[in-house]
C-alpha cells in the first residue's frame, strides 16, 4: 500500500510539472537591539511622587465608600463624594482604588504624613492603614483617621505601598489631600 501511494505521488508530480521556485529574499543585516527595543524616547520615567499607576486602574480620595454588586457578582468598592479637599471635622479620609487583574493576593498600605501642616513634622507618620487584597478582589479602600481626634488644616501626603511589607521597594506612588481651614459658622 505505501508503495502505491508513493508511485501515485510521483506520477501526480510528473503530470503537474515542476513547481515554481520562490524568489530568494535578500539577506538583511541585523539591526542593533537599541534601534527597536528599549529606545530612550520610548522610556517614560516613573513618578513615585504622583498617584500610583500600573496595577491601579483608578485611585482617588473620597469622603466615604459604598459596596456594590459588580457585573460579575463580585463586591465592588466605589467612592462616595470623591474629593481632595476635606473639612477639619471629617471623621476619616478614604482612599478608594480599582485594580487591574492580579494573580496572587497582596496588601496595599497607606502611610499618612503631614506635608505642609503648621506645627507638625513632615517626616513623622501620623497614620496608616492596610488592606489585604485577595485573588478575586478588584477594588479596595484605605481609611485614614485624624490624629488626636481632629485634622489640622494643611496638606497631607499618603505613600501607597504594595506587597507583603512596607520597604523602599514597595512604594507605588503618592496621594495628596488638603484639610481646609474651618469656616466661621
Where are these regions (language model features)?
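Bacterial N-terminal signal peptides
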Residues: 6-16
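Contiguous segments within soluble domain cores/interaction surfaces
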Residues: 24-148, 152-153, 159-163, 167-171, ...
Amino acid at each position: 500500500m505505501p508503495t502505491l501511494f508513493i508511485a501515485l505521488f510521483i506520477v501526480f508530480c510528473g503530470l503537474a510539472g515542476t513547481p515554481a521556485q520562490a524568489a530568494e529574499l535578500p539577506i538583511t543585516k541585523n539591526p542593533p537591539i537599541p534601534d527597536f527595543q528599549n529606545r530612550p524616547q520610548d522610556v517614560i520615567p516613573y513618578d513615585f511622587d504622583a498617584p500610583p499607576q500600573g496595577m491601579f486602574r483608578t485611585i482617588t480620595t473620597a469622603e466615604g465608600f459604598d459596596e456594590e454588586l459588580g457585573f460579575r457578582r463580585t463586591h465592588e468598592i466605589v467612592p462616595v463624594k470623591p474629593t481632595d479637599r476635606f473639612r477639619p471635622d471629617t471623621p476619616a479620609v478614604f482612599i478608594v482604588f480599582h485594580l487591574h487583574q492580579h494573580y496572587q493576593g497582596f496588601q496595599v498600605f497607606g502611610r499618612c504624613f503631614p506635608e505642609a501642616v503648621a506645627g507638625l513634622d513632615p517626616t513623622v507618620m501620623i497614620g496608616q492603614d492596610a488592606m489585604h487584597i485577595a485573588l478575586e478582589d478588584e477594588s479596595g479602600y484605605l481609611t485614614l483617621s485624624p490624629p488626636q481626634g481632629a485634622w489640622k488644616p494643611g496638606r497631607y501626603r499618603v505613600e501607597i505601598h504594595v506587597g507583603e511589607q512596607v520597604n523602599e521597594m514597595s512604594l507605588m506612588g503618592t496621594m495628596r489631600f488638603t484639610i481646609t481651614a474651618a469656616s466661621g459658622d
